[in-house]
Amino acid sequence: LGGAGGAGGVDGAIGRGGWFIGTGGMATIGGGGNGQSIVIDFVRHGQTPGNAAMLIDTAVPGPGLTALGQQQAQAIANALAAKGPYAGIFDSQLIRTQQTAAPLANLLGMAPQVLPGLNEIHAGIFEDLPQISPAGLLYLVGPIAWTLGFPIVPMLAPGSTDVNGIVFNRAFTGAVQTIYDASLANPVVAADGNITSVAYSSAFTIGVGTMMNVDNPHPLLLLTHPVPNTGAVVVQGNPEGGWTLVSWDGIPVGPASLPTALFVDVRELITAPQYAAYDIWESLFTGDPAAVINAVRDGADEVGAAVVQFPHAVADDVIDATGHPYLSGLPIGLPSLIP
């Protein structure tokens, strides 16, 4: 998905940002835990014929790169290689991501690992239809809702394998967990001093997956600044402590504003019952009473924990904001998104 675009940047300052993006700044990664922090550079594939024609193109294995896409792949490989070495290289089942990953893999003598969780969000019956169309709008509705804290919303594309945001996010976070584990198994330190891996994926999966999981989401960027071909979205953190958005196509992302932090608190509160309800629903089809009982029990525990944590999280964020330098920067808004 997404039109043709030029190579994006891979630089950015570590920090938290959100609905309001300020200048980048150092910030603590995640909200707790002693897990080792890593950096993941999510890189969108190069141009495909579908991109050039502005078509919805998500099916596996899909087409390869255009001549321009091959040039973009080599250009981003050269840029990334200069910032290496890397702990790992990953791509999806889509030919276009594999062809985009190949130049970097060849330069560094590494073998990319294929992760289905990096596949593009599946468009079902809307495959090969124009992006600018009713089908294109319907394709967007579900994933946008997922980033706003409603993963239970179904994908409004009949036939999609990503039936809702819960299914999509579990596949995506599973891929991220694999990247994390593999990175720690080969803890090569990049030029900037961080353990870093590169994951080649697709525009919507990168955007929606990161916005659903980072502690500084900015969902509007999905619409105002779609990731271009070979553009990069950089995150830092770990599965235990959480993930922070570092940069979006070269735009540094600064610390979270108070509204963003409170949004994340609400997101954590309202997603817990959605996941619990979906797990209970799935357990009903197993025909196993024990599975249903376990799903109900686990769901109750998760919802209870979210309810207990919510007021503490809100209080912490308000207290932090009282003396936080970015509190005075709340008026920073949409005009500053794109320099």
Task: Say what each PLM segment does.
Residues 38-115, 229-230:
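Active-site-proximal alpha-helix that buttresses catalytic centers in soluble enzyme cores
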Residues 1-37:
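Glycine-centric low-complexity repeats
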Residues 40, 195-201:
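Generic beta-sheet signal
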Residues 59-68, 94, 152-162, 166, ...:
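Active-site metal-coordination segments of metallo-dependent hydrolases
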Residues 36, 121-131, 190-195, 211-339:
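Acidic, low-complexity terminal tails and accessory targeting/binding regions
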Residues 78-85, 102-109, 177-184, 211-214, ...:
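Sec-exported extracytoplasmic/periplasmic mature domains
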Residues 108-174:
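Phosphate-handling substructures
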Residues 46, 203-204:
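Active-site metal-binding loops of divalent metal-dependent hydrolases
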